Amino acid sequence: MMELENYHAFHFVGLGGVGMCALARILIEKGITVSGSDVSDSAVLQELRNKGAAVFIGHKRENINNADVLVVSSAIGMDNPELQEAKSRDLPIFHRSDVLAAIFKWGKGIAVAGAHGKSTTSAMIGQIFHVAKMDPTIVLGGFTDYLKGNSCLGHGEHIIAEADESDGSFLKFATFLSVVTNIEDDHLDHYGTVENIRKAFVEFLNHVTYKDGGAIVCIDSEGVQAILPQIKKKVISFGINDSAEYRAVNKRYEKQNMLFDVYHYKEKLGTVSLQIPGIHNVRDALGAIVVALYCGISFETSVKALSVFSGVKRRFQTKMKEHGVWIVDDYAHHPTEIAATLKAAKEMGRHRVICAFQPHRYSRTKLLQEEFSEAFIDADVLFFTDIYAAGESPIQGIDGTLIPNLVKRRFPDKPINYVKNVEDLPKELYKAIKPDDMLITMGAGNIYMAGEMLANLMKGKGLSSDYKK
């Protein structure tokens, strides 16, 4: 296993990636030399430059001249010149999850995994620990206002991190608390079968290494329920389900805030108010509260922290709220996430919910096409674009028209539009939008830029054609 203390100069290939920049920031704050490269510049890379990182635009062999260890993610191909140079020089090469696993050894690790909600849940846990003055180290998969980024080096005993199950790397972490928000049939390109996915989560939950640690799980998930008999560690359950140890009940909206009551068995602990809508965020908040209670933080402190939690970037993030129109962006790219986000939007009582969706990966589109066809029930008007490949090669018969055709078959009365290129989408959305509408741009690719460009168009700033980032 990697020992951070054995290395002095880390080079990150793909430094601008959300998981990579979070780790780089931690190492810089720890006083470790960091360099890195990416294909294009960004605000994230500029921030790391300002903190002292040597940043290279473009991947070249000479970029790693001053490094004694290379860090890569699953997105880096074997033909990357920096990776090839590191191999030729016999430099140690580690996956980013190895760096995170090494950070977990600094203290009591709290790892959050699950098909959906792990970014928001881990961010909520971090905010609660901040308000409680626990000074945690935090590594997130999304950007938050309270961190002004997605990571921070703390001096307390807790390390809070999002654990990525997509490639199995979350099994490297030795934890104090392992949290699972849900288990679904995602990432089948890696696991092959749902059974293999569940086996991985069993191993993750059983990898709690502290005697006083435990497994905190959302029992609303059928996948979680299926593996409970195999969990050998202390289990604390939460959810809407009546059988949960900690329950969220009496969910309602007041002045666009989401309120719910929290019960521990039959004892009412109090009421929570969230700025972000939706039952999925209620579950995430409840999970964060349970983690905080387990670590000795009062319920009242959690309530205070969650009342000012503004969300995670690209998770129901407001882009514009003017001219009677509300433009929101959301990272949802799995059918369950899509359905939950649209349901939350519908419950907010706008005239129409318009959804512009960009499918993410050919493999996911193929494997979950039937689930996608059902996910858009709460959208009043739909726009679809071509598939965002995310580095995948095309699959014959799978393209951007697949999902809209299936949705049209299931919901023949819904207005459905196909706009192949994202850069053509803002003008089409501008024609469709009306006062009191909510528009949600949705997907894990570059669809968010369509909402930003539409906001500029509505504010009279015109359109930009920069859809590369």
Label every model-predicted segment:
Residues 1-99, 247-249, 269, 277, ...:
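N-terminal leader/targeting and accessory segments in enzymes
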Residues 2-11, 19, 23-30, 255-256, ...:
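Nucleotide phosphate-binding/pyrophosphate-handling subdomain across enzymes
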Residues 3, 26-32, 49, 62-63, ...:
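Phosphate-binding loop of NTP-binding sites
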Residues 32-39, 214-219, 354-358, 380-389:
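Short internal beta-strands
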Residues 37-38, 56-59, 94-98, 139-141, ...:
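Beta-strand->loop->alpha-helix junctions that form or flank phosphate-binding loops
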Residues 82-92, 196, 207-213, 340-349, ...:
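P-loop/Walker A phosphate-binding loop and immediately adjacent motor/lid segment at beta-alpha junctions
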Residues 373-435:
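C-terminal helical cap/extension that packs against the catalytic core
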